[in-house]
UniProtKB/Swiss-Prot annotation:
UniProt keyword annotations, A-Z: Heme, Iron, Membrane, Metal-binding, Oxidoreductase, Transmembrane, Transmembrane helix
Pathway the protein takes part in: Aromatic compound metabolism; phenylpropanoid biosynthesis
Gene symbol of the encoding locus: CYP719A23
Function, in words: Cytochrome P450 involved in the biosynthesis of etoposide, a chemotherapeutic compound of the topoisomerase inhibitor family. Catalyzes the conversion of matairesinol to pluviatolide.
Annotated positions binding heme: 432
One GO term describing the cellular component: membrane
Name of this protein: Pluviatolide synthase
Record-linked InterPro entries: Cyt_P450 (IPR001128), Cyt_P450_E_grp-I (IPR002401), Cyt_P450_sf (IPR036396)
């Protein structure tokens, strides 16, 4: 009897394994029947995964595109991913056929903190997404509300400068600017969510820590998307456990603030509550705004400082541009001054070109059967837009790997650069809704920091490491440390 049961169990296992193999082969055959764009040669089971190591993913894909074409197929195990990298293909995906590519290819693990893909960046396009985006861009991120934030943000920059001075005094003149800028960004995001009068440093500090912790697990989502069987791996299971732990931290942090708030109608919370969304969706939407906005302008400003530490001539030209507009002895650069600072705007653009905050954007998915540059793309296909490759295209940009703000000045080499090749915030239907506030925050921070301090290397002769690390956004692999010298002691 026991032998019969053993044989039966073995037979069942073999039948199950055979069935799974047949399903895999059927799917593989179905995929192979489609004429996908060309790409690097694959290996069984893993596809192209063995070719995606070494550098950060956006850099690896840019190198592969130079060999295999601006429209190529990368196989994440058995999953095809189309990567577009030049002006024409990127513009077709993001703008010309924006609605065709407006769905999202969200990882299952991301649903833990996004209320099952009910946040603005994880949900597919449709009536729900349109309502959510309209509420965000017409309310907290609308021009009237952003204008109201300007005097508050200017005062906050004065606070940042004071705290940097105190930090430097206690540490031999050396600071880590990213920490200060992140805290400023967190305060701004909190005001956009809860209203102008929101002022709660303990809450903001806790949110800052939660976002930093969660950023470390961005690679788990990629692992899941690459391997369908990743869910059975110990590392993935640990990642899921961490996501659930952070979800509880987020809930415990945000829930009491939401419950006690009386938000104005132009705040994000005011809009979310007006739609009668569930508490889970409200908390997910709030946290997403922190996750996407808290690090973006702060990290970009830090990249700019690193570039100018490496090139002191650029820093001096920017300082003189600031002085030309506001004069000597003025401690605060105001938002109204920024548009007059032409070299500042060039530095801002060149930083975003060199180090786009989301170099692969957020992965798109085809909502219908469509085409890209004449090639058929089936519904449900994941499409990555390599903004890093676009911003470093040698057919568009002179010396693309050199930091040259002058390329964006009128009459200089960059005068004829097409706007279609410079897309730091994406384009089309799913362009970043926080684009205007992000540019304002970055420009205001950079102008005030260069006006207040001269920025040099923390250790003489040791320049900042400009290596990328791709988390949810692109950050410096080695966080910047700098020596600051007050310009107006």
């Amino acid at each position: 009897m026991e032998m019969e049961m053993s044989v039966l169990a073995m037979s069942s296992t073999l039948i199950l394994a055979l069935a799974m193999a047949l399903i895999f082969l059927f799917k593989a055959k179905s995929s192979s029947a489609i004429k996908w764009p060309p790409g690097p040669k694959t290996l069984p089971i893993i596809g192209n995964l063995h070719q995606l190591g070494g550098d950060e993913l956006h850099i690896v894909l840019a190198k592969l595109a130079r060999v295999h074409g601006a429209i190529m197929t990368i196989w994440m195990a058995k999953k095809p991913v189309i990567v577009v990298s030049d002006v024409n293909s990127v513009w077709e995906v993001l703008v010309s056929k924006s609605s065709d590519y407006a769905a999202r290819d969200a990882a299952e693990i991301s649903k833990i903190v996004s209320a099952s893909s009910h946040s603005i960046n994880t949900s597919d396009s449709g009536p729900y997404w349109q309502t959510l985006r309209r509420g965000l861009t017409h309310g907290p991120l609308g021009p009237l509300n952003i204008s109201a934030q300007i005097p508050i943000q200017q005062r906050d920059m004065q606070r940042v400068i004071r705290e940097m001075q105190q930090d430097a005094a206690a540490n031999g003149g050396i600071i880590k600017p990213l920490d200060h800028l992140k805290r400023s960004s967190t305060r701004l995001v909190s005001r956009l969510i809860f209203g102008d009068t929101f002022d709660n440093d303990p809450y903001n500090d806790s949110m800052h820590e939660v976002v930093q912790d969660l950023n470390r697990f961005g690679g788990i989502a990629l692992l899941e998307q690459a391997f369908s069987f990743a869910k059975h791996l110990p590392s993935y299971k640990r990642g899921v456990k961490e996501f659930h732990i952070h979800k509880r931290k987020i809930d415990d942090l945000v829930r009491p603030v939401v419950a006690s708030a009386n938000p104005p109608s132009n705040s994000y919370l005011g809009f979310l509550q007006s739609q009668n969304y569930s508490e889970e969706i409200i908390i997910a939407c709030i946290f997403e705004l922190y996750l996407l906005a808290m690090d973006s302008s702060a990290s970009t400003a830090t990249w700019a400082l690193a570039f100018m530490i490496r090139d002191q001539q650029v820093q001096e030209k920017l300082y003189q541009d600031i002085k030309r507009v506001i004069g000597d002895g003025v401690d605060l650069v105001k938002a109204e001054d920024l548009s007059k600072m032409h070299y500042l705007q060039a530095v801002v653009k060149e930083t975003m070109r060199m180090k786009p905050i989301a170099p692969l954007a957020i992965p798109h998915k085809t909502a219908i059967d469509t085409t890209v540059m004449g090639t058929k793309v089936p519904k449900g296909t994941c499409v990555m837009v390599n903004l890093y490759a676009l911003h470093h295209d040698e057919s568009v940009w002179a010396k693309p790997y050199t930091f040259m703000p002058e390329r964006f000045l009128q009459g200089e080499d960059g005068k004829s650069v097409t706007e279609q090749a410079f897309l730091p915030f994406g384009a089309g239907m799913r362009i970043c809704g926080g684009m205007e506030v992000g540019k304002l925050q970055f420009s205001l921070a950079l102008a005030n920091l260069v006006n207040a301090f001269k920025w040099t290397s923390a250790a003489e002769g040791k320049l900042p490491d400009m290596s990328d690390e791709l988390q949810f956004i692109t950050v410096m692999k080695t966080p910047l440390e700098a020596r600051i010298i007050p310009r107006n002691p």
